[in-house]
Every structure is written in structure tokens, then in C-alpha cells.
UniProtKB/Swiss-Prot annotation:
Record has Lipoprotein as a keyword: no
Designated gene of the protein: nadK
Lineage per the UniProt record: Bacteria, Bacillati, Chloroflexota, Chloroflexia, Chloroflexales
UniProt name for this protein: NAD kinase
Superkingdom of the source species: Bacteria
Pfam family, one: NAD_kinase
Length: 276
């Protein structure tokens, strides 16, 4: 039973704005208290998310990531609706959103819990910041710098120093995003494993790796020139030599509402890879 729904739309997409209005009206007509807005509005008024039963995200993967960041602290599930090509995150399009909502209101669908990773930035023995990602945490060279040297330790055991454009630590969900483009393996999104992927590494015999779910990955910048820390493609925090980024699985999860059977992942995977 849905009592309160938040509808997140992309303000730069006419299709997303239009559908959000129509969907909000449709939900209200059926007795569902509905709030529509952009991510900044929901960040400024977190109670609008905390009080709802579901957030519907209308847009591409960027909109879904914004919805995830808004919802996982409150354990609120997200229904992603793709405007354009279906993606690895969104399995339904605008033509299915109304029937999908009816299915959910009638008790249908299932919860797809996705692992998150938590990254802590340390400098000189002090923790500067902490971040949570659904897809990946990346240390990469800045636009003007040469390759970066990133020393990687796993569970306090030194692995290697990558001389590369960057290093990715991804969740299983993120294995089909930037990590895949960088040559990493695809991991079933229901897995809690982590994926370590160097980006355009030079002179290394340590390839991409799938790590156990409780692995603690420490990446230390060993380059004199600066690098950047990105979390799900955002933040872009400047790093200096000696900075450490410690990544581990978060105790929190992000929950998606799914309407298709869970065994369709591999069929959908092949179809989307053929299209890309």
C-alpha cells in the first residue's frame, strides 16, 4: 500500500518534467500523497523523503544516483524509470510506469538491495571526509597532470603501485558503469563483492580483481602532482601526495523496487551490451 510518494525529476529534461506532473496528478487521484521536486529541493527538505514510502526517479542513471543518495539514509526504496534507453539500473520506461505503480499499490514487485561502499579520505593521520557510493570511488589524474602513482593495499596487505590514469573501487552495481568501460569484469549486482580496476595502467601485471565482500582497500597517492577523488562521478576532491582513501562496504544498502523477475538480469545484460 502506497500512502506517500516522492517523484524526482530532471529539471533539464522536458520529458521528465512533463511525466512528473502527469504521474503526480495520477497518484493524487488515487489517494496517494505525492510530492514532486528536483534533488536540491529534497536535499533542502529531507523530511519530504524520510516521510515517504517510495521515491520514483524519472530520468537517466544520473537521476537514479541522485535518488539513491537521497533515499538510502532513510531506507526508502527507489523505483527507477528510464527516459530513453533502459539501463542497468532502470528496467521500465514511461509506458510502464502507471501499470507498475498499480502493481506496487496492489502489493506486487520485489525489493532489490544493492551494496554501497564507504570511502574515507585521510591526510596526515586525520580523517578529512567520508562519502558513500552506489557505483564507484575513483582516484584519477587531474586534467593537466600526467599519470598518477597509486599504492593499493588490501586488508593491510600491499598489492601493488599502479602507474595509471586512475584506480576504481566499484560495487557490483558499479561493475557495469565506469569500471566496465575501464576493462573491469561484470559482477552480478546481487553480489556484495567489490571490484578493483586500474584505468589505463602502465607496466603492471596486476589486472582487475574481484574482492571479497569485507575487503578493505586503501589507496595512497604517491605522486607529487595532484589527483582527484570522485564518488559516483561527483565531488572531484583535490588530493595531494600522501593522501589515503580507505574504501570498504557500507553497512547501509540502497533498495530498488523491481517489477520484472529477478532471473532476467543476464538476458537484459546481453541485450544492453549488444546495444552499447
Amino acid at each position: 500500500m502506497l500512502e506517500r510518494v516522492a517523484v524526482l525529476y530532471n529539471p533539464l529534461s522536458d520529458a521528465s518534467i512533463k511525466l512528473s506532473r502527469e504521474l503526480a496528478d495520477w497518484l493524487v487521484e488515487r489517494g496517494v500523497k505525492t510530492t514532486r521536486g528536483v534533488s536540491q529541493e529534497f536535499r533542502d527538505q529531507p523530511h519530504l523523503v524520510a516521510d515517504c514510502d517510495l521515491m520514483i526517479a524519472l530520468g537517466g542513471d544520473g537521476t537514479v544516483l541522485r535518488a539513491a543518495r537521497l533515499c538510502f539514509p532513510h531506507n526508502i526504496p527507489v523505483l527507477p524509470v528510464a527516459l530513453g534507453h533502459l539501463s542497468f539500473m532502470a528496467e521500465i520506461g514511461p509506458d510502464e510506469v502507471y501499470s507498475g505503480c498499480e502493481q506496487i499499490m496492489n502489493g506486487g514487485g520485489w525489493f532489490d538491495e544493492r551494496s554501497l561502499v564507504r570511502a574515507q579520505l585521510w591526510r596526515g593521520g586525520q580523517k578529512l571526509s567520508q562519502h558513500t557510493a552506489l557505483n564507484e570511488v575513483v582516484i584519477s589524474r587531474s586534467d593537466l597532470s600526467r599519470i598518477v602513482n597509486v599504492h593499493v593495499t588490501i586488508d593491510d596487505s600491499p598489492l601493488t603501485t599502479y602507474h595509471a590514469d586512475g584506480v576504481i573501487v566499484a560495487t557490483a552495481t558499479g561493475s557495469t558503469a565506469y569500471a566496465l568501460a575501464a576493462g573491469g569484469p561484470i559482477v552480478d549486482p546481487r553480489s556484495q563483492a567489490l571490484v578493483l580496476v586500474p584505468i589505463a595502467a602502465h607496466l603492471t601485471n596486476i589486472p582487475s580483481m574481484v574482492l571479497h565482500e569485507d575487503a578493505v582497500v586503501t589507496m595512497q597517492l604517491r605522486s607529487r602532482h595532484h589527483a582527484l577523488l570522485a564518488v559516483d562521478g561527483r565531488e572531484n576532491i583535490d588530493l595531494i601526495e600522501g593522501d589515503e582513501v580507505v574504501v570498504r562496504r557500507s553497512p547501509q544498502v540502497c533498495t530498488f523496487v523491481r517489477l520484472r523477475p529477478s532471473n532476467q538480469f543476464y538476458t537484459q545484460l546481453v541485450a544492453r551490451l549488444r546495444r552499447s
